[in-house]
Amino acid sequence: MGKAKFERNKPHCNIGTIGHVDHGKTTLTAAITKTLHDRLGTGEAVAFDKIDKAPEERERGITISTSHVEYESKARHYAHVDCPGHADYVKNMITGAAQMDGAILVVAATDGVMAQTKEHILLSRQVGVPYIVVFMNKCDMVDDPELLELVEMEIRELLSEYEFPGDDTPIIQGSALRALEDPNSQWGDKILELFDAVDTWIPDPQRATDKPFLMPIEDVFSITGRGTVATGRVERGVLHVSEEVEIVGVKEETRKVVVTGIEMFRKLLDEAQAGDNIGALLRGVQRTDIERGQVLCKPGTIKCYKKFTAQVYVLTKDEGGRHTPFFNNYRPQFYFRTTDVTGVCNLPEGVEMCMPGDNIEMNIELIHPIAMEQGLGFAIREGGRTVGSGKVATIIG
């Protein structure tokens, strides 16, 4: 039995469920797969206990339990991430490689907004989850319509507080458990309503090839008589021969160069696109002018900075991290894309130390600039071993 071919006949979108523990994230995930399967005939129904017993994954040495399910709405194919534990969520959002295109925030109508509801919205803002749709769960257990209205108002205020459009965000009232029991009921209708909202509120993600060209430089060598070649994997966009690119990072000033040749697997290409491992021949560049850790990019699309705030997860001892806390002015290496840069951590006011297993927002200043933008991931390393993982939240300069 060969593997089924992945049919790319609908746009693809990465989403996940977020929200307070026991508000019904996993039940909703199961209800979505069952309802879409039973009502639209797409995908496969995945049982609650199969999602709940999420396998442990090790991503860059960090242990995270996550469940991945896929399903299809009328308009799109979705890959959906659900995590059983709160710590897993935080780790997944800060360290996970898969960027979410949007999230479904689950809030139990019986409890309203809770501590982790706030934390997940804040994290979404910090790590660059661009869109949130809300599912108010357990509405079958609330008899008072005024109470439902109050919870909805509370959610809208909270979203606005974290700079999401609270007034306009779709909020669907339903019951995941009732929909799971009978997808053809009015509660099943609510799941379809949720997906009409998700399909429209979360726009089609921009494909990597449509974004401006960027390639982190992994290696540099010179070919006598031809010039200097920079090699690496194209992160996004498309590059054509004889286009101008900019070399950004490490040095304060950037410079523009023309790409006179593109090579892949020893063959010459006219163009390279996201995902390709290439060598780019650069006109008039000395071997000493360019180094690993810089990026080639479409001119003017990315700048380099030294100072930024970041959302960071500090590995536990069991994950191979530190055994002891670190303090203000801690100076580790920050590994961005292809290179380590030394930097200084400034902890938030009133925070004296950071323990293994903590997640924390901190200010970081690097000793030399790196091409960066919000949401860029990095590892924190000490002597070559990873002790933390983070994402750029805001750029200071």
Curated annotation (Swiss-Prot):
SUPFAM superfamilies: EF-Tu/eEF-1alpha/eIF2-gamma C-terminal domain, P-loop containing nucleoside triphosphate hydrolases, Translation proteins. InterPro entries: EF-Tu_GTP-bd, EF-Tu_GTPase, EFTu-like_2, EFTU_2, G_TR_CS, P-loop_NTPase, Small_GTP-bd, T_Tr_GTP-bd_dom. Monomer. It catalyses: GTP + H2O = GDP + phosphate + H(+). It comes from the Bacteria. This is Elongation factor Tu. Residues 82-85 are annotated as: G3. HAMAP family: EF_Tu_B. Residues 137-140 are annotated as: G4. It comes from Lachnoclostridium phytofermentans (strain ATCC 700394 / DSM 18823 / ISDg). PROSITE patterns: G_TR_1, G_TR_2. Keywords: Cytoplasm, Elongation factor, GTP-binding, Hydrolase, Magnesium, Metal-binding, Nucleotide-binding, Protein biosynthesis.
